[in-house]
Structures are given as structure tokens and as C-alpha cells.
Amino acid sequence: MDSENSSSHSISSPQMFQNTHNNSAMEDNLLSRPMNNESLQMIIGYLRRNGLTETEELLTREAGPVLRVEGSNGLPPEEAISVEFDTFVQHANDCTDVVQAEFSQLLFPIFAHSYIALIEKHAATARIFFNRFKIFIPECFSEFVYQLSLIEDAMTLRANEHVHILRENKFLVRLSRPTLKHLESIQTRVIGVKNIIAKHICIENADEVSTNRTTIETQMGGILGVTSKSDKRHKMMFSVLKDELMQNIEKRKTKGKDWKDMGKKMQTHCPQADRIPLPPISEHLREERRNWLRDVGKMAIISAESPVSICMYTTVNAPIGVASCDFTDDSSLIAMGLSDSSIVMNAMDPMNKMKKLRDMEFLDKIDIETADNVQSQMFDLQGSTTSVRYTGHGGPVFSVNFSPDRRLLISSAGDRTVRLWSMETQRNAVIYRTPAVVWQAQFCSRGYYFATASADKTAAMWSTDRMHPLRIFADPYGDVGCIDYHPNCNYIAGGSDDRYVRVWDVCSGTRVRIFSGHKASIIAVKFSPCGRYIVSLDAIGNLMIWDLAYQRLVAAEITEQAGTKGSITFSRDGGVFAVSHGNSSIQLYSLDTLIGTVLAAGQNDSYIEPKVNLDGFNIGSYATKETAVIGLHFTRRNLLLGFGCFGQ
């Protein structure tokens, strides 16, 4: 980055050393002074500004004892913290733009632990320190800085959740070798800062030296810093076995040409079929896939040259508000979770009404062996309807989701229950009681299992025949607000308020991937149909695409579309995905374009620069007039369905 851009990102300091003399005057002035701490710091600053790195390091090493003895000018410890933090900020300001960006990772944890140390014994001094230096903390940590501002004394300190997290865990940063050399040179002058780094911060060596500031900043934002390289040790079976349906979709997409997305190689990353116990594929599901197979020839391939067609469904006269929605896989039904604790089910086609199973007395009279058209006799055709309302929850319904075979609906609400509804009897079948609110519940692609994201900082895996979770994943540090099941049913992804995206193995219960880079709470997460990529969305509108194979950030789309309810859905061929931020617009992105760019840059490289606001990645933006888009869904022919509540 050039010097002009570098200066635009500088970290200011309240005690900047301003030199108005020329070089010769500086030398004469310094040589005429006794070699005390102040003179040594002036000389070191002069050497740094003139690029004399080796001389600076040599002088710092030789003058270490003097600097350590007089490191804080003999000030009391509570005042020395301010002096040392200001010195650290000034040192970062004198560095190059990339090194300065790496140093900025250290500012928040040093600031936080300095403030925590002061507030316990010197509350008044702590407030002065906080108000003076809070403006130097990167914007991505502003929410955490606000949480620290709520601490007024030792009592509120002990009750603060963020303080417990920072004290019990080390903050992780990743620095390149040049930055580590700068850090070694400054630590001899700021002993208090050095002690904080040694006790509360873990520093890893960066594999590659970043070439620009943006690359470093895209990975910042987590409450405990970036993710560790040691998390890559877990092997992940992220691929999806390609059956006849998937092969036909791929053939339709490529028009007979060879697809270059490592298709053959990815087959080696498929899990064993018996790795987890899955229910057998029912005849109903087989029939659904045969129907889908017949639609493959009519499936549209979406691109920038061939834009998507969107059908928007809007609900009106709903003053209570709609909190959630979901479509069946065949797009025949839509379920709406309302804020008044009820669920409304509508048939998308008025001619295809919902049939209700007859009562038990009538069913007992049917002779299965001799009766004709048993299926038609089991259902009350005259009582079929296009709309059904379910009641039973005691709070807003935050999530609804259909099972793959369309026989069950799962819902979660503010009453701390997850309910399983039978589509055939149109009644509540099971109630799962949870210790906290469940923000989202999601079936796996084979049914039977489902996952939940909860306000008690956990994600969980359940089965429809058990009343208690089979797995509980308790490593997040904040509410898990969104969740998704991997297409091969072996993994669960969750996004939480601590700004990390995590992937758990449902077989072993271990966390196999963790990603950092979001700057706010994560409100939506989605696996790609191929199983290799994850798309996540946060509350301030940032969109991130992660590669599970290399555990890396592939691309980031920085927007200003803040929202609290996000929706992500992939096209049936997996080449495009649609995103809504809970506002009145729909964004379309091309995953194929992104993959092509990564392939051109060298797919086998374990390190690539994340693509930020990549040209050609966003292939369309579609706005509604006043309707907030709550849910999105691609039909089997790649028609995009949107759902929203007018005026919400």
C-alpha cells in the first residue's frame, strides 16, 4: 500500500512526539543530553522513522536495563499503565501500514486487561484511562468496549460476563516476523504491557506476510481474537456422495463439459455410509427424488447473463408480525411462525389442498388387505383445506422447518419449547422442553435428526424418538443464533453472538472447524450443496464465505444492510445463492464466479488472500417496495421464492 493510503489509516496518539528540526539539529540535540530514558526513547524513535531497523534493535537490546528500570518514569503503577499504553500506541503509529494493522489486533486485549486491573483498585483512574484511550480501539471491538464501559467498580467487574471470558481464556493474534521484531523492541520499554501479553495473549506466527491491511482486518472481530492454526488438525469428510440426481444436475449445469471443481478429488472426502446411523430412505422420499429428477431438464441455470426469476409472496393484515417461515422442498406448502405464538400453514397451490387423517375410530374399521384405495380412505378429502393454524406455543415462534418427507414440522418459540407437529393429523405430536429459548431448529436432509441453536450458548443434536438431546455442543461464548445441517448429515454449523462460526462432528461431538472475521452477531449460516463451503451473515450486513477444506476465509462482501433476521438459500445446482438481511431487498451472489477466481489464483495453495467485494460476485440486487424479506427458497426449477410481511 502506498504512503498516502498508509497515512490515512494511522493510529493517533495523545502524546505524539513532534519533531520540527532537521536531521543534523536532531543529532546535536540528542548528543548533548544525558543518556536517560527519555533520550533513549527519542533516539529509538528517530532510528525507527528513518528505517534504521538493525541499529534500532541493537540499541534497544543494549539499553534494555536502563529502559526497564525507568520504563514508566518512576510513576505509580496506576499511572504507569497509561504511559505504557500511550507508548505502545505511538510505536504502532510509527510502523508501516501492514505492521500497524497487525499491531491493532493487540490494542483491544491490552486495553481491556489494563482497564480491568485498574478498576479493581483505582476506579477513578480507570475511568480516566478508559475515556482517554477507547478511541484508539479498532471499530470491530466497539461492542466489547461498550460492555467494559458498564463496569464501574469491583462488584460490577465480577458480574461482567465479558470479563470472565477474557480472564479465563487467552486472546489469540497472528503476527508476521517483521511485526514480532517490532513487538520485541517495544516490550523492553513497556513492562506492564509485556506482562499482559505474556499472561493473557497467545501469539502465533503467520504462515504468510499479508500484503494489505484489509486482509488482516477481515479476520478480526472475535471476542478472543482469530482462530488457532491447531484447529486444522481435524480431518473433515465434507463431500456429498453424488447419486443419480446430483449427477444429472451437474450434467445439466455443465452442458456435458467437464466440471473443474475437483469433483473426483472431493469424492475421497465422503464419509462412510454407516458412519452415523441414518434411517432408511422411505418410499415417499424416493418418489420425491424421482419427481425432482424429472424436473432437472427444466431447471434454469442462473448467472449474470441469465438472471434469476423471483416470485414474491407477501402477507398483509398481519399487525402481530411474522417471525419465521419455511417452504417444503417441493414448494407446495409454506409455514409461518407468528409473533402471537401460532403457526399458519398455507398451500401454495389452491388446487393441492392439505388433507387431514381421519380419527382412530374410522381408521380401525378399514380392512387394509381387502379395501381399495386405502390411502384415500385414510384421509378426510372433504375436510381438506388450503390453510391450517397450529396453536400451542406460549411465545413468538422464532423458527419453523419442514421434514424432508413433508410429514413433520418442527418449531421453536420464546416459551423455551421445541414442538413437533404431525402434518397428517394436524396436531402437536411431541414437546421438547429446553432450559433456554431456542432461536432455530433444523432437520437434517434425511429427517429423523434435527439440530437446535439456543440462548444458553449451546447447540444440540436431537432425534424425533428421544426426549433429550443426543449431543450438546457447549463451547460458544455467546448465544447460538443460527444453525444448519451439512448435506451429508455428519456435521452441524452454528453461528453465535461471540462472532465465530463453528462446525461440529455429530459422530464424535468434537469441534472440527472454527472461523473468525465477523464484526457482529451472526444471524444466518448455510452449507453449500456440495458440502465444502459455508456462507454466513452477521447483523451489520457482512457476508463471509468459508472453505472447509483449508479452514480459511475465501471471500467477504462488506455491506451496510444491517438486520436481525437473515436468510440464505442456494440454487439447486449450487452455483448461486440468495441472501436477505431482513430488510426490503434480495441479493444474488455467484459461488461459481468465486470458485473460478480462487482456482485461477491457485487452488492447491493452503493460503490465499480473501477476496473482499470481488467484482462479479454480486450478480443482482432486487428491492421490494415496503415488504421486509423474511425467507427465501429455490424451487426445483431454480425459481426463487421470497416471503415477507408487508409493512413489518
From Swiss-Prot:
Residues 35-67 form the LisH domain. It is found in: Nucleus. The keyword Flavoprotein does not apply. It holds the Pfam family WD40. Transmembrane segments: none annotated. Disruption phenotype: RNAi-mediated knockdown causes arrested development at 90-100 cells and inhibits differentiation. The two E cell daughters (E2 cells), which form the endoderm, divide abnormally early. Phosphorylation of the RNA Pol II large subunit C-terminal domain (CTD) is reduced significantly in embryos. Reduces expression of a range of genes, including let-858, rps-5, hsp16.2, and pes-10, but has little or no effect on expression of cki-2 and sur-5. Has little or no effect on levels of the TFIID subunits taf-10 and taf-4. Residues 1-13 have a biased composition (Low complexity). One of its GO terms (cellular component) is transcription factor TFIID complex. Component of the TFIID basal transcription factor complex, composed of TATA-box-binding protein tbp-1, and a number of TBP-associated factors (TAFs). This is Transcription initiation factor TFIID subunit 5.
